[in-house]
Amino acid sequence: MNFMKFALFFSAILSFQVLCSQDYPTLRIIFTGDIMGHDSQIESALNTGTAGYDYTSCFRYLEPYLSSADITAGNLEVTLAGPPYKGYPAFSSPDELGTALHETGFDILLTANNHALDRGRAGVERTIEQLEQQGFIHTGTFKNAFTRALTYPLIVEKNGIRLAILNITYGTNGLSPEPPAIVNYLDTIQILEDLEKASGARPDFTVVTVHWGLSLIHISEPTRPY
């Protein structure tokens, strides 16, 4: 099977160390960038012997790093909307992609990005269902306002350290979510409300992940200096 190249743009490794003393807890987090699924990647994952898909080989060199953190999170920039499986411009990858991500060490998948609505409301809902069935923590898109109010901002506690995580996108390629589905957009008023709610959960750290910018560049755009 050909190795597949998943874009891990803007990857960052964050280490939170409360104090230098070993008497205090530490938390190591890895955030990766875009996990994509173009047509060539889907074709490379096809197991012709079983007619299923196997993404294991594409992550084998990353697994030692991604599994070494206390928490590993990534931007899932595809839907798991079921067949037909397609890449750009309306991404839907096989469920086996999620299986491989879980086995590689991903704990959290962030779903607010410009491809969140590639397969409409049904795609949002099925992606959420698959992530939950596969044991992921996830945030960024929601089936309805009730689940958003109940689960967002995402609160995660590990090693005695409490995190609040917000996930936002600049847009969804001109598509609007069909109610009751919700995508977190770059809305200043809503973000301030979410930050206030996060503060009420008394996190030790608040992490805000925003999906924006141009593909295939390694520096910030002039309009995105922060």
For the regions a protein language model found, what residue spans apply to each?
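Bacterial Sec-dependent N-terminal signal peptides
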Residues: 1-23
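Acidic, metal/ion-coordinating pockets
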Residues: 22-220, 224
